[in-house]
């Protein structure tokens, strides 16, 4: 990670 701002976007 690095900056957890689009966690759901990454898990899509």
From Swiss-Prot:
Asked if the record carries the keyword Cytoplasm, the reply is yes
Which keywords fit this entry according to its UniProt record?
Answer: Cytoplasm, Proteasome
What compartments host this protein?
Answer: Cytoplasm
Q: Which GO terms describe its cellular component?
A: cytoplasm; proteasome core complex, alpha-subunit complex
Similarity section: Belongs to the peptidase T1A family.
Q: How does it assemble?
A: Composed of two subunits, alpha and beta. The complex is formed of four rings. The two outer rings are each composed of seven alpha subunits. The two inner rings are each composed of seven beta subunits.
The job of this chain, per UniProt, is described as:
The proteasome is a multicatalytic proteinase complex which is characterized by its ability to cleave peptides with Arg, Phe, Tyr, Leu, and Glu adjacent to the leaving group at neutral or slightly basic pH.
Q: Report what the protein is called.
A: Proteasome subunit alpha
Originating species: Halococcus dombrowskii
